[in-house]
UniProtKB/Swiss-Prot annotation:
InterPro entries: AAA+_ATPase, ABC_transporter-like_ATP-bd, ABC_transporter-like_CS, P-loop_NTPase, PstB-like. It comes from Ruegeria pomeroyi (strain ATCC 700808 / DSM 15171 / DSS-3) (Silicibacter pomeroyi). ATP binds at G50, P51, S52, G53, C54, G55, K56, S57. Signal peptide: none annotated. SUPFAM superfamilies: P-loop containing nucleoside triphosphate hydrolases. This is Phosphate import ATP-binding protein PstB.
Amino acid sequence: MNDMSRVERAVESKQTKMECRDCHVYYGDTHAIKNVNVDIADKTVTAFIGPSGCGKSTFLRCLNRMNDTIAGARVQGSFQLDGEDIYDKRVDPVQLRAKVGMVFQKPNPFPKSIYDNVAYGPRIHGLARNRAEMDEIVEKALRRGAIWDEVKDRLDAPGTGLSGGQQQRLCIARAIATEPEVLLMDEPCSALDPIATAQVEELIDELRQNYSVVIVTHSMQQAARVSQKTAFFHLGQLVEYGETGQIFTNPEDPRTESYITGRIG
């Protein structure tokens, strides 16, 4: 059995949203991601887990070409969204990031009003013809971000004035305002308290009804709670990928078991 046969365990059949093949990432001479092959299922939460420095965030950034913004980064391989190569020279990275949104580790609302934070992307992409349409887009995104009821009477207030948990939900609303197909989340709860974390986790479960969600997390408990599929990265390699319950209860690779049981990390 070759390495890919071990990684590509049988998983529940679901339409593939993104297909990644023979993927490598280099930072200068450093080979950060080594021959990763993975399919991201539609309307599913996929968790990337692994020790610090294992490459999970680097690989996540490949999925919407955020590594393009890092000096010296070089990406090789095939990354397809609905069968289309996202690294094709004809693809506009800005347009791609409207389809593949991202939420970062630390809440980063713009220094604008709550309304303008959410309206920012739709304005850039010309999604509203008038104020009424923009109002509808903003309300829909804030509702899906599970924060509408908390901010509907103060949309002109600065987004930076919200609590940490509210700011992160605002950033999620901002990311989904452009109606993406995939939502990437890089440690979205690491800066939040337990109550705010629970709110975001509940929101993630709701979001998968409409989007493919990929989340990087250092918390194995969080991965087990929110995801249906889990990928374990170690030293730049995808070691194992499969159904979350199977990965956590009966992993095939001893390195996965060692990480889950705390022997490596």
